[in-house]
Amino acid sequence: MHRMEQRLEIEQFICRSDNYGVLIHDPESALTATIDAPDAYAIEAALERRGWTLDFIFTTHHHLDHVEGNEPLKEKFGVSIIGPEAEKAKIPGIDRTVKGGDEFTFGLFKVKVISTPGHTAGGISYYLPDAKVVFTGDTLFALGCGRLFEGTPATMFHSLEKLVALPGDTALYCGHEYTQNNARFALTIDPDNSALKERAKEIARLRAHERMTLPSTIALEMATNPFLRWHDRTIRARLGLQDAPDEAVFAEIRKRKDMF
């Protein structure tokens, strides 16, 4: 089967309180990876549901709620743990380090590493172009972006620029189910955006039934996520930043979210 025809299977679930667990599986090679390891028990349960065994952990950043399952999963499955070079000292059990611009293979799929610091100093995202999917950890959320624990607004802005350069039909998976709260904030920044208003209603319907709001797409985020709409004239006018650099518009939106 030609690579472009091969389907990546994805199993997504909520764990801890609001973390997303995400397993990816290549049926051709029977390889399975988890994007981060927030909860070993939840990941094991998902593997059992699907009849998969775990081969890899792809770590996006070092925060405990993304790596706490590393060592128990490694002990049980003998997985190989891949993670950011810049954070290797903080990632339990890491076997292989990668950095922005690196590529490796996962079964039939090419994995491109994108350097996306800001939330942490060395955070990365994993992009699988043949599957049209990107895993952004806590850098880009549905209708939001990560808090700047170890980076500056400029750092995060440049990371987001890399992600919005991906094809619009790229599916987005991120680290947390924060979407409904993000929608409430987004409407304070971009209240006249009809696409955002409709999306907020759909998110409310989903969450009322405890359903997941992801995946999103890069195109949907560019149309509705205020953290990616630094170019929008209406938003700029609302912020009083009509002629400001894009980076300054983003920084003001991030500042307002921190106080929301």
UniProtKB/Swiss-Prot annotation:
Keyword Zinc assigned: yes
Catalytic reactions of this protein: an S-(2-hydroxyacyl)glutathione + H2O = a 2-hydroxy carboxylate + glutathione + H(+)
Binding site for Zn(2+) 1: 61, 63, 119, 138
Annotated S-S bridges: none
Listed GO MF terms: hydroxyacylglutathione hydrolase activity; metal ion binding
Record EC number: 3.1.2.6
Keyword Transmembrane in annotation: no
Principal EC category: hydrolase
Binding positions for Zn(2+) 2 per the UniProt entry: 65-66, 138, 176
Keywords per UniProt: Hydrolase, Metal-binding, Zinc
Cofactor names: Zn(2+)
GO biological process assignments: methylglyoxal catabolic process to D-lactate via S-lactoyl-glutathione
Pathway(s): Secondary metabolite metabolism; methylglyoxal degradation; (R)-lactate from methylglyoxal: step 2/2
Note accompanying the cofactor annotation: Binds 2 Zn(2+) ions per subunit.
Family: Belongs to the metallo-beta-lactamase superfamily. Glyoxalase II family.
Protein's job: Thiolesterase that catalyzes the hydrolysis of S-D-lactoyl-glutathione to form glutathione and D-lactic acid.
Assembly with partners or alone: Monomer.
Record-linked HAMAP family: Glyoxalase_2
Designated name of the protein: Hydroxyacylglutathione hydrolase
Source organism of the structure: Brucella canis (strain ATCC 23365 / NCTC 10854 / RM-666)
Gene: gloB
